[in-house]
Amino acid sequence: ALRQHLLRLQQYTKKDMIYLARGGFWSTAPFIFSSVLSIALVWAFANLLPKDIYGTYKFVMTLSGSLSFLTLTGINIAVTQAAARGYEGVLPYALKIQLRWNVLFTIAMFGVAGYYFIHNNALIGTAVCILAVTFPLTTSFNTYGAYLFGKKQFRQIAGYQIFTSFFYIAAMVSILAVTDNLLFIITVYALGSLTPLLFFYYRTLQLSGEQSQFLAEQKAQFLNYLKHLSVMNIFSTLSQYVDKIVEIRREIVNRDK
C-alpha cells in the first residue's frame, strides 16, 4: 500500500519517491538510535561523574571545538559533491589534504596546552594534548561517510553510524562506571570516537575497489569549493563556542575560589 502511494505521488513530483523514502529512513535511523543511546550517556555523566570533573571535561571539549575551524570543516560537503559526480579518487585525496592541513589545529592546541602547563594546570594541559593529536584524526577519517552519502549508499552509512555510536557510548559509559579520572575519560572519548572511524574508512576503501585517478581539473574544482565552505564556517564556529568558553571558564573560576 505504501509503495502504491509513493508511486502515485511520483506522478506529480516527477521524482523517485521510493528511492527518497528509503534514503530518508536510512538517514533517520542512526539519529534515532544514537539519541536513544545518548540517554544512557547523559545519565552516566549526571550520576557517575563529580560536577567539578564534569565541568573541566566540558571546558576541555569546548576548547577543542572552538579551534575546530582550523580543520577543513567544509570538506565533507565537498567530498559528497565530488563522489556524486563520480570522482572516485576523492576519498584518499581528501584524507591526505586533511592530515596535512589539520596540523594547524594540533599546533594551536599544543599552544593552549603550553599555556596551562606554564600556569601549573597539568591536568587541563595534558587533556588538551590528547585531543590535539586525536581530534584531527577523527575529523579526517570520518570523511568516509560523506563519500558514501555521495555514492547514495544510505544503508551502508546507517549501519556504520549505528555501530560507531554504540561503540563510543558503550566505551564512555564503561569508563565512567569505573573511574572519574579526567585523563582516562578524555582518552576513552578520543579512542572510542576514532577507532570505529579508522575501521570503516579502510573498509570503505576496500569495498570501493580500485580508486581511479583524481585528475588535476577535478582537484581544482574540489579545492575551490572546499576553500569556500571552510572559510564560511570559520565565523559560525567561533560564534558558537566563544560564549560557551567564557561561561564554563567562569564556572570553574567560581568553583575554585
Regions found by a protein language model. Name each.
Residues 16-76, 110, 165, 169, ...:
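Signature of the first transmembrane helix
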Residues 66-70, 103-107, 121-144, 158, ...:
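Alpha-helical transmembrane segments of multi-pass membrane proteins
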Residues 2-16, 20, 155, 159, ...:
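Interhelical loop/hinge segments that connect adjacent transmembrane helices in multipass membrane
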Residues 46-54, 115-126, 151-155, 166-197, ...:
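Membrane-interface helix-loop junctions in multi-pass transport and translocation proteins
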Residues 27, 31, 58-61, 98, ...:
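Residue-level recognition of transmembrane alpha-helices
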Residues 13-18, 49-53, 67-100, 149-155:
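Transmembrane-helix boundary and interhelical linker motifs in polytopic inner-membrane proteins
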Residues 1-2, 32, 71-73, 95-120, ...:
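Alpha-helical transmembrane segments of multi-pass membrane transport and lipid-handling proteins
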